[in-house]
Amino acid sequence: MFCIQCEQTIRTPAGNGCSYAQGMCGKLAATSDLQDLLIYMLQGVSVYATKARELGVINPEVDTFVPKAFFSTLTNVNFDDERIIAYAKQAAEYRESLKNAYEAACEAAGKRAESLPPVAQFVLGTSKPEMLSQAPVALLNKDKNEIHEDILGLRLLCLYGLKGAAAYMEHARVLGKTDAEIAGRFHEIMAFLGEPSVDADKLFTTAMDIGQLNYRIMAMLDAGETEAFGHPEPTVVNTKPVKGKAILVSGHDMKDLELILEQTAGKGINVYTHGEMLPALAYPAFKKYAHLVGNYGSAWQNQQKEFANFPGAVVMTSNCIIDPNVGQYSDRIFTRSIVGWPGVTHVIGDDFSVVIDKALSLDGFQYDEIPHNITIGFARNALMAAAPTVVENVKNGSIKHFFLVGGCDGDKSERSYFTDLAKSAPKDSVILTLGCGKYKFNKLEFGDINGIPRLLDIGQCNDAYSAIQLAIALSQIFECDINELPLNLVLSWFEQKAIVVLLTLLSLGVKNIRTGPTPPAFLTANLAKILEEKFGLRNTTTVEADLKTMLNVA
């Protein structure tokens, strides 16, 4: 086992990364090894998908399968070995199908089929023990003693960034949005990563390419969400329980939320969002459901306590899931799509009857708690509509600064930095937030500036696209570069979606971003120095020191 993809990973003087029997996230060594093997199989599929594409052969099923299966290896998504094995076997079948199609296309074109790299020729074992014995060939640091540590760091930056992009591709696909050109570029990068490069310049360029690709993917996902559910609008949301039977929907998948709302209508069940599903409450399409009563709980790392106290059924539509046995609610939590946990019921298809029956069998909340409201829904359309008013307040001096503070949340005590930063931001500044990092301060009161709320909740982590659009619009209005705006980005990272959002921002030329609370363990000191020199990327320090720098206070 070697896994170094999230903030929780082990860091020691002898080296970084989870190994031995179990990772810090709870992932067993066998699961980690099987996930590495799955990635290796998917890279082989992408090799053939790329070669076949050159001859006009495109398999749409493969184009959607590879990102989806890749997503299953993201932090806190799938801990079920049998599900990972099934994905690997399916990858082998798709690769064989593409191989045959490629060779047939070569023959039809009168050309000789190329000899492809080992990753495209690997023969997957037929049993779990055999697959585990094959794991060393797919180990991400298998050649660490032969290469410079910076090369390994760059490879992992690319791999984890592409994994985040794959997650957004799958979110878009669920909403009916795919793009053959995006899929083709995705396969090219997967294939490239399947042949471990030692070219630092090529790897760095690839990292920026992944960022550019993800910008297009986020635009596609934004279109999927807004076309399906309308544009988010400023909305007041209750964060306290309401009396009645209950279902909690966590993750990111709004299509699943819609299905659950449709199937629970008239059944006396209240539905709550959790974590990154909170932004759904701002979409017009969901406001017709009176039994969508609010948001329960906070960010993913608190779920073992929050889910244990939730007297209903819980549905995990995507990341993040952690051990449900700790809070003894494994019999009433359900997984969907790429999510998996051993022994937890997995809902296949669009019938949520098993979830509904479980919710009806449970007590639900016995009384209404005193409401606590927050305001959400300041996504792209709402931000653009407010832009003229914002500009006027900037010009008259009422608004002097903007902070984008968001990203992933986590359980490190150092993350209090983000709470303290938001609370310490000057009263003439506006704070934009997104992702589950918002839970560090989104229930606090920040007031307004001439009617403009000082805290603007943009949405999910992928709604960084909305923030980018606002920054572009403001830079055009003020006729300046994005980096000349009175705007500072402070991003909290935990896993691979945050990595690809960061790569997207860097690829667009956004500079002087701060990330924290700790830098990714796979980034060497030398790589961190290069990123600081090239982009001004730096780690957070203290709120007082960082604010002085950001506000240009001597």
From Swiss-Prot:
GO cellular component: cytoplasm
Predominant subcellular localization, coarse grouping: cytoplasm
Domain of life (superkingdom): Bacteria
Keywords, alphabetical: 2Fe-2S, Cytoplasm, Iron, Iron-sulfur, Metal-binding, Oxidoreductase
EC class: oxidoreductase
Localization annotation: Cytoplasm
Pfam families: Prismane
Residues binding [2Fe-2S] cluster: 3, 6, 18, 25
The protein's Enzyme Commission number: 1.7.99.1
GO BP term (any one): response to hydrogen peroxide
Residues annotated to bind hybrid [4Fe-2O-2S] cluster: 252, 276, 320, 408, 436, 461, 495, 497
GO molecular function annotation: 2 iron, 2 sulfur cluster binding; hydroxylamine reductase activity; metal ion binding; peroxidase activity
Coiled coil location: none
Cofactor(s) demanded: [2Fe-2S] cluster; hybrid [4Fe-2O-2S] cluster
Family: Belongs to the HCP family.
Biological function: Catalyzes the reduction of hydroxylamine to form NH(3) and H(2)O.
Name of this protein: Hydroxylamine reductase
Organism the protein comes from: Shewanella sp. (strain ANA-3)
